[in-house]
Amino acid sequence: MEHAVELPEDIQEQMEALSEQGEEAFDQGRYEEALDIYNQALSILPEPRENWEAYVWLKAAMGDACFLMDRFDDGLDHFYEAYTAAGPQNMNPFIVYRLGQIYRRLDDEENAVEFLMRAFLLEGEDVFEDEDDLVYLRNRVDLDDYSEDGGEGYGYGADDDDDDYGGRSSRFDDEGFSRGYIPRDDYEEYGDD
C-alpha cells in the first residue's frame, strides 16, 4: 500500500508529542497508559488512517504493549492491522516476528511457523529476540535449506529482483506469502522453484 508521506504540520507536532509520551510510558513499563496515548495519536490521523505511515508504527506499538501484557488476542489484532497496512513491499521484520510470537503463544503452530519463517527470510537470525522462538522454528524447519549463507536475511526481501530466493524458499510466492504449510519432513518432494 502506498502511504502518504507528510502529515499537516499541526498534526505532525501533536503526533510527535504524543509519540514521545507514549514511548516514555512504554519504556517505563506503563503499557496500559502507553496504549491510551497511542490511541489518542491514532485518533488525530486524517482519514483514511491506514494510508499514513504513522498508522503502521502506532498499531505496531499498540500490539507490542499488548504482547508485553500477555494480551495476545489484542496484540494479534493490532499487529495484523499494521502488517496489512504496510503491505508486502514495506514489510517490517519486527511486525512479522511479533505475529509469529503471538501465534506461537496462542498455540497456532501453522501460523507461528509461517510468520517466524517470514521474519527469518526478511532478517535472518538477527530478528529473533527470544532464542526459544528460533529453536521452535529450527525444530520445524531446516533453516539452512532456506539460505545459502546460513540465514543472514537471504531470501524474501533480501533481493527483490531474485524470484527464486536462492532456490530454497519454495513455500513462498513472489510477494512472500505462503502457498501453504509444509511440514519439515515434506520439503524434499516440493523441490526448488
Q: What label would you give each PLM region?
A:
Residues 3-8, 45-52, 84-89, 126:
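Flexible helix-coil transition and linker loops at the boundaries of alpha-helical arrays
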Residues 41-45, 80-85, 120-123:
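Amphipathic alpha-helical segments of tetratricopeptide repeats
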Residues 104-127:
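TPR/TPR-like (Sel1-like) alpha-helical repeat modules
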